[in-house]
Amino acid sequence: MTAVQLGSLTWLPAADHLELLGAPVAAALPGLSGPAWVASIDEGSADTAAFTDAYGVPATASANCVVVAARRAGETTLAACLVLATTRADVNGLVRRHLGARKASFAPQDVAVAETGMAYGGITPIGLPASWPVLVDPAVAAGELLVVGSGTRGSKLAVPGAVLAALPGAEVLEGLGQPVD
């Protein structure tokens, strides 16, 4: 694995440092279609704005994973949306229609944490339940190397966009990421 240079962090092969990952992420790592690196961070800097300020990683090299609850006829479907940190997921429009839901919104924090087994602020598409749709913005899929959560607030993963787009349940969805107003 070639060394990764992204911001001021020291990136290490994730497969050699499973202790830095959330349990579901560590379990899913062997199934990835490509490489992943991990870097330890201060837990207080896990949120995107604080992370980019603290470590000099541009927001354009970061992808956010949001958990969405889509409802129709009393049934709730959970899904993940993966968009660049410079955009927001079109949850109420495109995501709602794509999932065939009457209503879609961000899943409550307690639900997102319980259903993913990951820490809030560290939720990542790697290691999500296999039944979940993982909607990926084309800009994420095309990214050379993107920073995503690691399942904990104490580290981040760097993963090629193509690896994220090849995750189980992943579907590249044009128009998912919308410019932030």
Kindly label every feature range from the protein language model:
Residues 1-181:
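Extended, low-hydrophobicity, polar/charged segments
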